[in-house]
Each structure stands twice: as C-alpha cells, then as structure tokens.
Amino acid sequence: MYKIKFTLFFYVLLSFSFIGKSAYAANDNINSLANSYANLVSHYYNEVSLSTQEMHNAIIKFVQAPDNNSLTNAKNKWIAARSIYGITEAFRFYGGPIDGVNKYGEEGPEGLINAWPLNEAYIDYVKGSPNAGIINNLTLEINNNTIIAANMSEDDADVSSGWHAIEFLLWGQDFSLETAGIREASDYLPTNEINIRRRAYLVATSALLLEHINWLSMEWLENGEGRKAFLNKNDPGGAILTGIATLAGFELSSERIATALDSGDPEDEHSCFSDQTHNDVKANFNGIINVYLGKGLNGESFRPSISEFVAKNNIKLHENILEIINETNISINNITVPFDKMLSEPKNGPGRQAAEKTVSNLLVLAKNFKEAGKDLNWEVIIAE
C-alpha cells in the first residue's frame, strides 16, 4: 500500500490544468473516462483475485498441517488480500456488479463478501457458549449451500460468509485492547467431529469468497457483462463520483468510524477480531484517492481520470479536494492503533480526536465531490 505524498500529487495534478487544449482534447470526453475507469476497476479486481487465491492456498495448507506457523501465514495472507479488497470498495454504490441488480434480476455478491458486524455465536463457539453456531449444529451439513442460505437469513448480524467470517475463524474473539484475537491452531486439529467441521467450514468459506472475487474480476474484463453495463450508462461520470462520494460521505465516515465512536463498542469496528480496522480505513481512503487520481496498485496511471475533468473545469475546487485529501491522510494516520484501544480513550483523547477529524474531513470531501459533479453536469447521489 503506497503512502500519499501530497506535494507530489498536488503538482502532478495541478499540471493537468496547463495541458494544451489540443493535447487534452483527445481524452476530453466521457467515453474515454468511462473506459479508463473500467480498466482501473479491472486492474484492482484482478489484484484482489490473485491475493485472495494466495490466502486460500495458505488456508488449505494451514488446515492440512495446523500449527502456529501455518496459522500465522494464513492470517498474514488474509491481511494482504483484505488490504487490496478495501480499495475496491470505491467501486460500490452506483449499481455495479458488486452491489447492484443485473438485467437478470440477480443481486451482486457484496453481502456474501463483506457483511458486518458479525455475530460470532452464529458461526462457532464463543466465550460462555461452547456449543454455539453452525459448526456445532450437527444437523447442518457444511457446504456452500448451507453457508449461503444461512447468511443474514434472519438477522443482519447473522453473517456466515465472507471476509469477516474467515477473520473470526482465524483469529477468534478479541478480548484485549492490546492484541487481536488469539485462536489456537489446535482448534483445527482433526481430533474430533467439531474440529473437522470447523476445518471444512473455513475452507468452504474461503473457497466461496474466492469464487465471488473471481466472478467480479471476470465481470470487468474486456467482454464482461458488468463492464458493458457500466460503459452503457448514460452518466458514467456521475456513477464514478457517486461511488467515491458515498464511500467518503456515508459508508466510511458514518458507518465505519462514527458509529463506533458514538457507541464506544469494539463490536462496531469493522475488523474487530484481527485488529485491522485501521488498515480497513486506510484501504477505503486509498480507494477514494486512486479513483480520483486514476492510480493503480503500484502507481500505474489510468487516464483520463476524474481529477483531470475536475481540474480542467474548476481548478480551485480541484485544489480544495487535494488539500482535504492531504488533511484526511494526516488525521487517519493519527488514529490510535488498534482501533478498539482508540475507542477506550476519553472523548478528548488524541486518537479519538483524530478519528473525529477524519469523519469531518471525509464529509467535506464528499461535499466537494458532489459539487464537482454539479459543475460537470453529472448527477452525484450520496447513497445512505
């Protein structure tokens, strides 16, 4: 994950405003922007697919030979894949393949991939309830159909699949402000029926996540249905800005940071078992930046970008966006790690203040994105 260097970005983006009209004209149209964005999305989903495959391979190796080393490796692969997936959440909220409904009436897989918060007892044993969850319910066969059917079947917190189900199965419950959950590798030794079911559940959930990620990757390939649908949108610029404005102005600021700040409950943090919520926040924010600037995972350039259109149309607004991006980057990096430790701080604690500042900055950023859309005659809707 690269870090934001504001001065560099500022002068690179500012230079776009001085590109001659003849040089810019070739790319100064909405079709070029839509294709560039589709290439960016495809790039990231391909990267997530590769990293999720690595995680799945590590999980299989762990289950085959459960010990602390193989468990740690599986956890590290989860963190690596998760950090890239978080960037792709900037591709949500406008009816795309991830969370929209396609022409066949089929809903995207987002709820099976990233639903949270998660009721741990719905899946497996928890403190005080040693026989809880699907894993301990011997009447249920552990397979894809069971996991999919169980996901949020009666309550939104009854999450059975996706990143956070895997996270819980790898880390277990987190009872400490200093460390993440500490599940024992011995939970996966094939010494009893429940452990065997737990092994099967972890592998099945990981395979299901990989299947959904691979599907998303294929949707955005050159001839993918999701890509075609996006390129046929009447207002692709508005869709792109809606995605990053909603992530900034609602999902990340409100749902993922402010809700936890208001409740003070670690259960409201995004990746509470692994203590990776701070990286979730950074990944989501990087997704917003990368869409705006047209940047790939390793700094690849996808042009034209939204930022070029904004800068050419309203350089002052573009400068304001870059400034608030820089300020938000600073406030995010000042949030206490781990996130649950920050939640335990008093209201005037430095980590809490940084989190509050991040929320307010993200709201300003979303407002600026919406203003940019209005200036460009694109419809930007901040979904809630």
Language-model segments: which ranges?
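Sec/Tat signal peptide C-region and signal peptidase I cleavage site
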Residues: 19-25
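Bacterial N-terminal signal peptides
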Residues: 7-18
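Positively charged n-region of N-terminal signal peptides that target proteins for export
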Residues: 1-5
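Mature extracytoplasmic or organellar-lumen-exposed domains after removal of signal/transit peptides
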Residues: 26-384
